[in-house]
């Protein structure tokens, strides 16, 4: 019989041997631990494939075993699969390992420096894995233990280690929304850097400044975030780890987006995507990180269709790496939910957006406390979707139920945002604006007006008179005055202001202009100004023609398959533009 007609393919000798060891796991358990790390991991992966999670969990919960498995660097994706399966199964392997490491650090406090140095190295690898896997609280516990060991020796090597600890701590605290601890972590890192400087030593500051930028961005301190991104870019040098370079480019791009420096943002994020795929591969979590930020850029420059495609690609990667109930998967679901909501806003088809929003909330509520800040944005997205579904619903009872659910979600999001950021913050203002829109749908017009005005005042003071966020809130207040309160003169002024900001930032084909143009057509019809009605019908027709031509060909992923510039050229181009323009804030 020809080989191609075989209905099965024989196992390799190696795989047969691994299967034999697993079949005799109980008897050979101790011997397995003496195998080289790659072979030892393959035995454990076979346990995972056979669904023997209790046995796998008992192995991975032992710090010595897991530390050895972590040395099999080329198996990291497969390790994420095993680890997530254990977490989903209810084996709290992340917290067990973090506790074991912390306890070991307390035991060796009196040991010599070499023992502590070895423990710190183990901690960096363990904490790094937990951080990459999204188990931020456990990673934080590990890094705090490492930092404690560093403080026991007042010498140069441990100052370098302490700086690295602080950078990693800042990263996991940012990821876990512990922003109140972020600035003190940064200051501690600076203290150690100053010590090093006094002794003629320098630690590269790119990663630290990049994490500070992420912290300030999350708190909506956009001017400060931009300033520190510039400082981080200055620190990019030859020999810096690619991961650090990619992360700094990502953060700088996001800071440029919110400052509406779109050309700079495009150059930075496209190079970050290219660099991540070229270095890590197209199935790596770091590549998915860059895709999420690329999607953020595309959404903000109004290339909504491509942004949805990029967010979907990022989610696919994260699901293939992590699967299960993982925070990285949840954030990708949320980003895709919001972009799908924006994309389908005109059509009213929100099934896909709602699915992803509910998946995000389901995952977050399963693995994090019910008052965790990450829930604020997911609940906000679901509330926006429910409101639109309610508006299109013909059953009054169902409409009221959906609006009430959206109201509860918005209020919960607002309370979480105020607790984390205070009243005077862009995130809080967004929630006020969302409540304003909802109250309009609920026909509570005075409450709606109050919320919109509050949102506009906060955004104007924080972002200036001509920001995109201000235009959104101004347009929403115009809609309220036009459709429900008959305040046509006020509505007209607000519509024209919103249109002017939109055109200035995004050009004549900006998608948000449609709602302002339609609002003005309705307004001029209401007051009998038919000349203006005709004028804006023509404007809307021209806008539609522009939209048909816009983004009709470009494939966003194809667009980043190569980079015309080296990393050094990208960095220098950014810094030279900065020098020409002068400081932003």
From Swiss-Prot:
Modification after translation, per record: Rapidly degraded by the proteasome upon overexpression of a C-terminal fragment of APP.
Keywords carried by this UniProt record: Cytoplasm, Cytoskeleton, Membrane, Microtubule, Nucleus, Protein transport, Repeat, TPR repeat, Transport, Ubl conjugation pathway
Main location: nucleus
Subcellular location: Nucleus; Cytoplasm, Cytoskeleton; Membrane
GO process terms (BP): intracellular protein transport; intracellular transport; proteasome-mediated ubiquitin-dependent protein catabolic process; protein ubiquitination
TPR repeat spans: 50-83, 120-153, 206-239, 288-321, 333-367, 429-462, 471-505, 514-547
Pathway linked to the protein: Protein modification; protein ubiquitination
Transmembrane regions listed in the UniProt entry: none
Membrane in keyword set: yes
Membrane topology annotation: Peripheral membrane protein
GO MF terms held by the record: ubiquitin-like ligase-substrate adaptor activity
Activity: how regulated: E3 ubiquitin-protein ligase activity of the CRL2(APPBP2) complex is inhibited by APP.
GO cellular component: Cul2-RING ubiquitin ligase complex; cytoplasmic vesicle membrane; microtubule; nucleoplasm
Subunit structure: Component of a CRL2 E3 ubiquitin-protein ligase complex, also named ECS (Elongin BC-CUL2/5-SOCS-box protein) complex, composed of CUL2, Elongin BC (ELOB and ELOC), RBX1 and substrate-specific adapter APPBP2. Interacts with APP; APP interaction inhibits the E3 ubiquitin-protein ligase activity of the CRL2(APPBP2) complex.
Function as written in the Swiss-Prot or TrEMBL entry: Substrate-recognition component of a Cul2-RING (CRL2) E3 ubiquitin-protein ligase complex of the DesCEND (destruction via C-end degrons) pathway, which recognizes a C-degron located at the extreme C terminus of target proteins, leading to their ubiquitination and degradation. The C-degron recognized by the DesCEND pathway is usually a motif of less than ten residues and can be present in full-length proteins, truncated proteins or proteolytically cleaved forms.
Name this polypeptide is given: Amyloid protein-binding protein 2
Source organism: Mus musculus
Gene this protein is translated from: Appbp2
